[in-house]
C-alpha cells in the first residue's frame, strides 16, 4: 500500500502503530521552492493551528511549516520502532533519476532492473530552484537548520 498525501508526514506515530515494519519514503522538495509555490492548501487548512499569525507573511510561514513538518517526520521515522526510513529529495530524483530510483526500488524490495525505464519517465518541474530568482526569503534558525539537515545549501 502506498499513501502519498503530504499531510501524512504529520501522522507517523499513527502509521507506525497501525502498520508494524512500515516503510516510509520521505519525499521532499526544497522548502524555499515550496514557499514560492502557489500550492498553499496545507497552510490555509492548518496554518492557524501550526503557525498562528501566518497571514502576516505566508511565504515565511510556508517555509517554517515545511521545516517543522519535515524535521518532525524524519525524526519520528528514525525514532519509532519498526519504521524503515528512506529520504528522497525531489531535486535528486530530477537530476539523477536512475540513481534515485534504483535506491528507492532497493529500499522497497523491488527489482532495481527497472530503474532506467522509470528514470526516462521523470519530468522535472520548471520550478526547481525558482527561489533563487525571487526576493530573498528571511530564514529563521529553524528553517536554516532544516535546509541543512536535508542537504540544501
Where are these regions (language model features)?
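Glycine-rich phosphate-binding loop used to anchor ATP phosphates in small-molecule kinases
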Residues: 1-11
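Conserved phosphate-donor/acceptor-positioning beta-strand/loop module used by diverse small-molecule
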Residues: 4-5, 15-40
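Residues at alpha-helix caps and immediate loop-helix transition turns in enzyme cores, especially N-
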Residues: 11, 15, 97-100
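A secondary-structure boundary/capping signal
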Residues: 27, 89-90
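Acidic, metal-coordinating catalytic cores used for nucleic-acid/nucleotide bond scission
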Residues: 33, 92-96
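PAPS-dependent sulfotransferases, especially Golgi type II membrane carbohydrate sulfotransferases
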Residues: 39-51, 55-62, 67-87, 95-153
Amino acid at each position: 500500500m502506498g499513501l502519498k498525501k503530504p499531510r501524512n508526514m504529520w501522522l507517523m506515530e499513527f502509521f507506525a502503530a497501525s502498520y508494524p515494519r512500515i516503510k516510509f519514503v520521505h519525499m521532499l522538495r526544497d522548502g524555499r521552492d515550496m514557499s514560492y509555490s502557489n500550492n498553499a492548501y496545507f497552510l490555509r487548512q492548518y496554518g492557524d493551528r501550526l503557525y498562528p499569525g501566518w497571514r502576516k507573511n505566508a511565504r515565511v510561514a510556508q517555509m517554517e511549516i515545511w521545516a517543522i513538518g519535515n524535521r518532525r517526520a524524519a525524526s519520528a521515522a528514525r525514532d519509532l520502532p519498526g519504521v524503515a526510513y528512506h529520504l528522497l529529495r525531489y531535486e535528486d530524483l530530477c537530476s539523477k533519476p536512475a540513481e534515485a530510483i534504483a535506491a528507492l526500488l532497493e529500499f522497497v524490495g523491488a527489482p532495481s532492473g527497472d530503474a532506467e525505464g522509470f528514470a526516462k519517465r521523470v519530468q522535472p518541474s520548471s520550478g526547481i530552484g525558482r527561489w533563487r530568482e525571487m526576493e530573498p526569503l528571511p530564514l529563521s534558525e529553524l528553517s536554516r537548520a532544516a535546509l541543512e539537515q536535508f542537504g540544501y545549501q
